[in-house]
Swiss-Prot record:
Subcellular compartments: Cell membrane
Gene source species: Sinorhizobium fredii (strain NBRC 101917 / NGR234)
InterPro entries attached to this UniProt entry: C-N_Hydrolase, C-N_Hydrolase_sf, Conjugal_tfr_TraB_rhizob
Family that this chain belongs to: To A.tumefaciens Ti plasmid TraB.
Gene: traB
GO cellular component, one term: plasma membrane
Keywords, in A-Z order: Cell membrane, Conjugation, Membrane, Plasmid, Transmembrane, Transmembrane helix
Transmembrane parts of this sequence: 16-36, 51-71, 76-96, 110-130, 135-155, 159-179, 252-272, 332-352
SUPFAM superfamilies, per the entry: Carbon-nitrogen hydrolase (SSF56317)
Role noted for this protein: Enhances conjugal transfer of the plasmid.
Entry protein name: Probable conjugal transfer protein TraB
Domain CN hydrolase: 187-387
Membrane topology qualifier: Multi-pass membrane protein
PROSITE patterns: CN_HYDROLASE (PS50263)
Length: 387
């Protein structure tokens, strides 16, 4: 009887530990998240399954309240509210699909995993355990994803100890042979530490400073230089002409974040600039829900939010390379990367502007997610972040 009383507490505490450690921003700790389905399956009631799901997700996304408070220069309450709301889809899906029947449980968990990987539930599908596939099975590609998914199903059965041992073996093998993600030849990502001024300070001098940074990095065979999300601020013909003129006489191609505005809202974009001109290269598929993407705006007659281009432009072309672009929030959810991988890109370019995440592990988690997917599909990775 005492054991029955303690089990819900122990499972909930364990799920919090798993969420905290697995999503701490260290690539080799990602497989810890695979313990979540074990804990979920050990719940004896739907209520306990809900507590386990909430504990895991809230721990994994623990940096959100502080980040939102920094972004809006407000107290913690708005962030706490968003944190709880964001956990809703994860908790609801895993609570509704939980079952006592052991024969149905693997298929119920598979359905939950799929729902949290694709829209609409996948819009807040952070902390997905399947991301660990890149750590366990580097270079396996789609077969690694299949193996991880099958293993996740096995972890909710009576065979879970054997599956866990197998996963641990692959984990140790991967850790022993771990190497940093390779940077593609002729590409260079630039990390900046310009805080909240990046994209907001749109002075000519700021652009000249960025141009100088680009030219400094474009050496030793580097021809493609990547700048962080929002680095150029608003995308205008004036700034385009400034950059194109500055790049005359060079072979440099710049890929940078910017905002393209029109009468109906704006797109969070990547633009490409060279001596031949500039153009919008990529429009973000999934902006940050709430702060950027505000679907209720159309119902209220407002049009100041970022547009979501859900399944558009999964791969773009830069020179002779096919690129899978990921901007900020897209690195935290599953489907943008997997959609891009269907088109067999040559490399992944992941950018972000995480000044507002100071003191949290959000940027580290974004980087780790990008690294994990690049490892799984054996793709070169270019990272560029502002903090």
């Amino acid at each position: 009887m005492r054991r029955d009383h303690l089990q819900p507490r122990l499972l909930t505490i364990a799920s919090i530990v798993v969420g905290t450690v697995g999503w701490s921003g260290y690539a080799l700790l990602l497989p810890v998240a695979l313990a979540f389905p074990i804990l979920w399956s050990r719940a004896r009631t739907r209520r306990v399954a809900a507590l386990v799901s909430a504990g895991y997700f809230l721990a994994a996304s623990r940096g959100l309240p502080q980040g939102v408070a920094a972004f809006y220069t407000s107290d913690l309450w708005p962030g706490l509210l968003l944190w709880l709301c964001a956990s809703g889809s994860f908790v609801v899906v895993h609570t509704v699909l939980w079952t006592k029947r052991s024969d149905c449980r693997p298929f119920r968990y598979l359905l939950a995993a799929v729902l949290m990987a694709v829209p609409p539930m996948g819009i807040t599908g952070w902390a997905h355990p399947v991301t660990a596939a890149g750590i366990l099975f580097p270079g396996w590609g789609w077969w690694g994803l299949v193996a991880t998914t099958a293993g996740l199903m096995g972890l909710v059965t009576r065979m879970w100890p054997a599956v866990a041992i197998a996963f641990t073996g692959f984990w140790l093998w991967s850790a022993a042979n771990w190497t940093e993600s390779k940077l593609p030849a002729s590409w260079q990502g630039v990390d900046l530490k310009l805080g909240s001024t990046l994209g907001r300070n749109t002075s000519i001098q700021r652009h000249r400073d960025l141009i100088a940074t680009v030219k400094d990095r474009a050496s030793g065979g580097v021809r493609n230089v990547v700048l962080p999300e929002s680095a150029l601020g608003f995308w205008t013909p004036t700034f385009e002409r400034l950059w194109v003129k500055a790049l005359q006489g060079t072979e440099i191609s710049v890929i940078s974040g910017a905002a393209a505005i029109d009468a109906t809202g704006y797109d969070n974009v990547l633009v490409t600039l060279s001596a031949d001109g500039g153009r919008v290269l990529y429009r973000e598929r999934m902006p940050v829900p709430g702060s950027m993407w505000q679907p209720w705006g159309s119902w209220l007659g407002e049009s100041d939010g970022a547009r979501a281009h859900f399944f558009a432009n999964p791969v773009v072309t830069v020179g002779n390379s096919r690129v899978a672009p990921l901007i900020c929030y897209e690195q935290l959810v599953v489907w943008p990367t997997l959609q891009s991988m269907l088109y067999e890109p040559d490399l992944i370019v992941a950018v972000g502007n995480g000044w507002w995440t100071k003191g949290t592990s959000i940027v580290a988690i974004q980087r780790v997610n990008a690294i994990a997917w690049a490892k799984l599909f054996a793709k070169p990775l270019v990272l560029s972040f502002n903090t």
